[in-house]
Amino acid sequence: IKTAVEIMNKTGAVNVGGLMFADSKKGLQRTIAQAMRSKLGVGSSKFHTGGSAGESETVYLGTFKKSAVIAAGGFDERYIRAQDWELNHRLRKNGGSIWFDPRLVVTYRPRNTFRKLAKQYFQYGRWRRVITRQHQNTANFRYLAPPIAVLVILLSISFAVLVNPVFITPIFIYFASLIVGSIFIGKKIADKLLMPLVLATMHLSWGVGFITSPKKLFKS
């Protein structure tokens, strides 16, 4: 906290945070941790994958300047997921700066089963859709890639069955890219073998959650 406050005073940022270092030494949980630190798994967000110190869209946890939070409208308790991103968005919209520093590291223990991982990322997707409804023009490729992947897979299967088997090609390309990426992301042989399934679970669960997110999920 002392380091975060020093950075805040030096940079003038209204929120200072660092890296969510997903880590585990146990089986599937270890593989999931590696996926959550990879760009193929979670995109290029600094607080997941690391990077140099500087302004950021959001940070993990964070040390907030109280007056700035109050000026931005406070913490919105209606959000079940993505609360930190939503608050940081309002802070930035209000003229504040969010600062990432890689020296601030918090160890995170990820889910340890496919079922729990799928449920987690399904909820992430659902609430990301809520964010895009409440704050228009905030969706970027990182957030839209999973639902696009789900739609492409569904269309590929439909066209392959109804028109021509060649339309199954995008699915093969998607899973081939996961397999190739897993070779570089996975640390051990077991990780490399499990990684494609872990990545697909993260991507597709998020995508399905985003697509099926009901408007009534957010109580206005």
Question: How does the language model describe each region?
Answer:
Residues 148-219:
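Membrane-embedded multi-pass helical conduit in multi-pass membrane proteins
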Residues 2-3, 30, 86-90, 127, ...:
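Alpha-helical elements of Rossmann-like donor-binding domains used by nucleotide-donor carbohydrate transfer enzymes
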Residues 15-25, 32-61, 70, 134, ...:
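Short, flexible, basic/aromatic active-site loop/helix in glycosyltransferases
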Residues 76-139:
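Catalytic donor/gating beta->alpha subdomain of glycosyltransferases that bind UDP-sugars
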Residues 48-81, 90, 94, 102-103:
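Conserved nucleotide-sugar donor-binding catalytic segment
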Residues 1-38, 97, 102-109:
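Conserved donor NDP-sugar-binding/catalytic core segment of glycosyltransferases
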Residues 139-147:
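Select subsegments of transmembrane alpha-helices in polytopic membrane proteins
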